Amino acid sequence: MGQPLPHGHGSVPIGFSSEPRELTSGGNTDGVKPTLVTGATGFLGWHVANRLLARGERVRALVRDPSRVRELDGEIVVGDLRDPESLERAVAGCAVVYHVAADYRLWAKDPSELYRSNVEGTRNLLTAARDAGVERVVYTSTVGCIGMPEQGPGNEDSQVDLEQMAGAYKRSKFQAEQVALEFARAGLPVVIVNPTAPIGDHDFKPTPTGKIVVDYLKGDLPAFVDTGLNLVDVEDTAEGHLLACERGASGERYILGCENLTLQQILTLLAAISGGKAPRWRIPYAVAYAAGLASTGWANLTGLEPRAPLDAVKMARKKMFVSLDKAKRELGFNPRPVDGALKRAVDWFRANGYV
């Protein structure tokens, strides 16, 4: 099992600037090495960084565009996963790296962009971490890298076939996970976490799961397909990252999820929370597939993002139901029911002009 790492204490009330700078805090962080978080301008990375800050960590965020940083205190370093020199600067002096950043688009006109960011970017970052003597890396994979058996939920030992994986996102994340395992075998302490479908506030883009909430609230989901997700509170997912750092074993992966729910159940929960009505009509998979094919074909011609990406439809063919036993047993992961996170998501999207 991985050994616990030391944590600082106190708050860190300083905002991001366009240049790297040291943190000041009410507590004493002198001599405490910074923790690097990639993807801190995104949904999950933002929550991981905030969780660390709340525990008094010295947090350094790797960002491509400082103007996108919102409501987050810490130190900033501008860089890109595709630029090894910028990563060397980012990891310098860090004890721990949380690699949360990913290109999670379910459609891209040039799918090779996902491989450059997700696969080669991960290799670049882990190389920099190894060369800088980083003590611990938490790599954020995805539940999409967990196999879904015909019977019962998937777990960390459930294998997937790369050739049968739907889309560049899943394939690139699978290959990136293999890179992380390669570095772990070579001696870099790398723990892998596989979040399911986080939900909650500050979903800026939003993510595909957040988009379900937004589309429902806007009345753009009059019907649903017969699929299922494992939903988890994004705050619990962030806490799971910290637990993986403290207690996880290098070279192991841990599913961070909570409740296995059908899409119909999710929409029913949203109706109860928002005061709306749940859709009643189920779309046959063949109809959804045809719509995805047409939508994606038009996107490939125009360059405009498809309304229903074909890869998303393909992913929906299987219910992404998983077991949390390993994370609960080895990490002490204890997620809360997701209705509170769904309510925070609804309230945040409404308050911030998404609907």
Predicted region positions:
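Substrate-positioning beta->alpha
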Residues: N124, Q175, P208, V225-C245, ...
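Glycine-rich "substrate-gating" loop/helix at the edge of Rossmann-like oxidoreductase active sites
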Residues: A166-A168, T196-K205, P222-E235
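N-terminal Rossmann NAD(P)H-binding glycine-rich loop of SDR-like oxidoreductase domains
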Residues: P34-R55
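Conserved beta-loop-beta element that borders a ligand/cofactor-binding pocket
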Residues: S141, Q178-D201
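Conserved Rossmann-fold NAD(P)-dependent oxidoreductase catalytic core, especially the SDR/UDP-sugar
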Residues: E120-Y169
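A hydrophobic C-terminal alpha-helical subdomain
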Residues: L221-V225, L231-D236, Y285-E330
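Mid/C-terminal beta-alpha module of Rossmann-like enzyme folds, strongest
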Residues: G240-R307, R329, P337-V355
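NAD(P)H-binding glycine-rich loop region in Rossmannoid oxidoreductase-like domains
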Residues: S67-R68, G74-E120, A128
